[in-house]
Each structure stands twice: as C-alpha cells, then as structure tokens.
C-alpha cells in the first residue's frame, strides 16, 4: 500500500471514528485494502498516494448522501467489496464519509 503521511493521518482519523461505533468491529488488512467488519464487511479502505477510496457495502440508492459524494461502482472493477465509493483526500471529507459509514454500519 502506497501512501504519504497525510493519507495515513486521514486513515487513522477514520479508523478511530469507525472503531468508536461499537465494540463488535474487526479490522482485516489484505494486500489491497483494509476491511472493517461486523457480521460482514461494511467498509473497505484502499490506500492511494494522496487519498483514500472507501467502498461501502450498500447500494448508493440506499444511502442518504446530501453532498452527492457517493459514486456507484457496481458495474466497475475495483478492490474491496461494496458498490458505493467515496473519496477522502482532505480532513474536511471525513465528516461526510463517516456519516455514510455510520449508515452502512447500522444496517449491517
């Protein structure tokens, strides 16, 4: 996984918020991404040099996304499971991403 310090800071902020959702969350790192699981994977995070790609295990139509940040990737090849993608490249993206992650976690 290639990333810089700022990308790792974004990941660590997100990871801490995700883990605070509940004590039933398991982290499973793979070669290509990091999976966060409850009963099943609800989000996968792919590290890129200057951003994170989050794959949410929900259809984009099921998510409340007032900022239109979610991209439907159900017909596009990608790492991780999940049909909805959101990009996190700046700390200001974290609250929006986390609100979407929370929605998927609560449904899992």
Model-inferred region functions:
Residues 2, 19, 42:
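Charged, terminal alpha-helix-loop-beta segments
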Residues 76-108:
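Well-ordered alpha/beta subsegment
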Residues 4-5, 22, 71, 102-105:
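Generic secondary-structure transition motif, activating predominantly at the C-termini of alpha-helices
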Residues 11, 15, 98-101:
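A generic alpha-helix structural signal
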Residues 13-28:
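Surface segments flanking catalytic/ligand-binding clefts of nucleic-acid enzymes
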Residues 28-84:
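Short, conserved beta-strand/beta-arch hydrophobic-aromatic motifs that form part
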Residues 1-14:
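Solvent-exposed, charged helical/coil patches
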């Amino acid at each position: 996984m290639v990333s810089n310090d700022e990308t790792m800071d974004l990941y660590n902020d997100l990871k801490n918020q995700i883990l605070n959702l509940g004590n039933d969350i398991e982290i499973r790192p793979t070669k290509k991404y990091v999976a966060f699981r409850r009963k099943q994977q609800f989000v996968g995070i792919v590290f890129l040099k200057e951003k994170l790609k989050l794959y949410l295990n929900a259809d984009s139509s099921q998510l409340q996304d007032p900022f239109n940040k979610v991209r439907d990737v159900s017909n596009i090849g990608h790492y991780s499971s999940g049909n909805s993608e959101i990009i996190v490249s700046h700390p200001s993206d974290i609250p929006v991403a986390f609100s979407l992650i929370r929605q998927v976690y609560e449904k899992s």
